[in-house]
Structures are given as structure tokens and as C-alpha cells.
């Protein structure tokens, strides 16, 4: 390499450093560890049952790069546990109809509360735009989620038999001998598969409280709220599953053998169908952030450029 080429390279380095060093004058690197606790729920079109919210919990490790005091980027990894489902209170269905003295009598089974809950463990990778102020920060951006383990739980509380007299519009639970009533609770568990990759929109608003400030580093305790919404619609993952339980009773010499329909099976019936659903989380977040010392800040402020 001759002298002319070396001079050209040094000039290019000078131009690059003159543009880059002022930009680094306010650059900051943040390392964060956080805990999220809140509510998970489904957004779905359904009239027969109601969504049942439950717990969402997650941990997050992330790295943020702020090229200025206003704009930055954040990337990281999260481990989340979501639980939500659907439920129906006062579930009633007909077992059979019999005639006694030319009067139809309807034998039903009733369930005080019928629920189906889905629990998902997942790993997420968020990539968010950071808008920061003096002590307030707002993050928003996409999040790629990889489900790891998905389970479901069906349970029925306070299930019993009853007899309904249509002409009198009267329902009897205990006194009629043919409806040997029995109250019980039953639970069934299983696993299912969901989409391998899901896209979410993640947002967070937080307030930073300085904890430690020194010449070479800073640390903050961050308190805020978060809201994550799934952009990937989930379809029914257990379309061929059998029913929830078997109800049988032989008291008073009247045998009864009936499969109780699960919530998901009921949802597939005509207008009761929930063809797809979206999961969302909302809650509080507590995190600890560390901003290590950046020696380039001092060099940028003093415009010290070094060449070789």
C-alpha cells in the first residue's frame, strides 16, 4: 500500500469518526432483568360461554442500546406462562325424556360450573423501539413466541341429575326417585399442540428510579405496566377429543350412563362455535437495569480521535 492510499484511508477514518463520535456522546447500553405478573385472557367471538381469565407470569432478560437520549432499540428473551380458557355457569343438557301417565318428563343433568383452561409455557424474543425521557421509557414492537408445552384441563363442579316437568315448568332435583341425584366434581387433563411460531405485539411503559450512580456505571429500579397481544389467531387444537367424563348411578334400581359434553365440544355446535381466538396479557412489571461505563462517551465529548 503506497502513501497515497494510506492518506485516503486515514481521511475516510477521520470522516467516519467525526460522524460517529458525536453520536456516541449520548449512547448508553442497558442490561435488564425483569419479572412480569398479570392476567391472561382470550379475545374471542362467543355467546354460549365466557372467557375465563387467569394468571400470566414471565421473566425477561434484555439488552437496550440508546444512540441518543430519546430513541433506542431493545432486544431480549422471555420465558412466559399463560393460562386462560372458557367456562359456562349453570350448564344443563337433556339425558332422556320419558312418558308417565301420558305426561312427558325430562331427565336432565346439570353442572354448576363447567370450565376448560389452557396453559402454555413459551419462549419469546422481543425486538422493540425505545422512546425514552428523563426517567420514563416506552417500548413497543413485535415479539416472536415459540410455544414449548401446552396443556388443557377440563373440570365440572357440582354436577347432578334433575327432573323437569315441561307442562308445569317445574324442576325437581332430589325428591323424584328416578332421578337419583348425586353431586360431584371431576377433572380431566391432557396436552395439545399449537402453532410452532406465533407473532405478538408487545408494549411497555415504565418509570426508572435511580438506585446507584457512580462515575463508571448507573443502575435503576424500573416499575411499569405491560400489555402483550397475540397477532396469531389460535384455532381449536383438540377437535377430536372425547368428552369430559362419565356420569353413572344405579341407586333405586335405575341405571344411568351418560357422557357429559365438554366445553369445547359444545362450542363446535353451530352458532356456539368459537373458530379462533387471540390471547393477550396485561399486568405489572418490575425490573433492575444496569448501565455500565462507556469510555467512548468521554472521547466523543472531547473529540479525541485516534489513528494508526
PLM features: residue spans?
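Cleavable N-terminal export/targeting peptides
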Residues: 1-28, 291-308
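Short glycine/proline- and aromatic-enriched beta-strand/turn motifs that initiate or cap beta-hairpins
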Residues: 26-66, 287-293, 306-308
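Short loop/turn motifs that connect adjacent beta-strands in outer-membrane beta-barrel proteins
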Residues: 27-28, 66-73, 131-135, 210-223, ...
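Transmembrane beta-strands of outer-membrane beta-barrel proteins
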Residues: 29-35, 71-77, 121-125, 136-146, ...
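Extracellular/periplasm-exposed beta-strand and loop segments of Gram-negative cell-envelope proteins
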Residues: 41-54, 82-120, 147-198, 233-281
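Exposed, low-structure sequence patches enriched in small/polar residues
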Residues: 140-145, 206-210, 307-308
